Amino acid sequence: QRYREFLIRCSRNYDHVFYVAGNHEHYGYDIARSELAIRAFVPENVHFLNNNDYIIGDYVVLGTTLWTDLKNNDPLVKWDVERYMNDFRVIRNNDRRFTPDRWWEEHFRSFQWLDKKLDEYNDKKVIVMTHHAPSIRSIHERYLHSRSFNTNYGYFSELDEYVEAHPQIKYWFHGHVHNSNDYMIGTTRVISNPHGYPDTDDQNPEFKFDLNLNLD
């Protein structure tokens, strides 16, 4: 209900709203059915992108959750993320447990789609929107030296070289981490501006409510 109310407010304030689902949308639900439930309640001018593209002006927007690659499907990483991350306790998968293997399948499917679309739009200006981050540079330094470092691979995929090889990507917007980012990978500007969990102390002190970007 809170998601629906938030999206309705956004739809009233903007002509176009682009929405990519994260991991929390699936909490308490079945990932195999969540997309249909979301599409059923989003307003008409809210573009829910789950491996979908949308052309607006001179830009093509490519949207996907892009679950991480778990360090190229590394068994030790899969063991650690399953042990420490809530996703595997509160998300269902066709009435069974959500597992690291299913997570990786979601990543593979999304990455294959993204790769195909970037080939298709190699002569266009592209905005990529994902929930998970495309680089370790988006991870706050306080997590880089933790004993559970491998759990960071549940937040990003190492796509720096891939992004540099696709200069048509002018912007890459992402969420998931609870810290702000604004940096360059080659000619691509990577930005995150998360609010953090509502009604908790886990919020981003650098969140900019009035962040505006003038696209070239």
Predicted features and spans:
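Active-site neighborhood of phospho(di)ester-bond hydrolases with catalytic His/Asp-centered motifs
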Residues: 1, 18-23, 47-51, 127-130, ...
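Short secondary-structure transition/capping segments
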Residues: 15, 41-42, 62-71, 98, ...
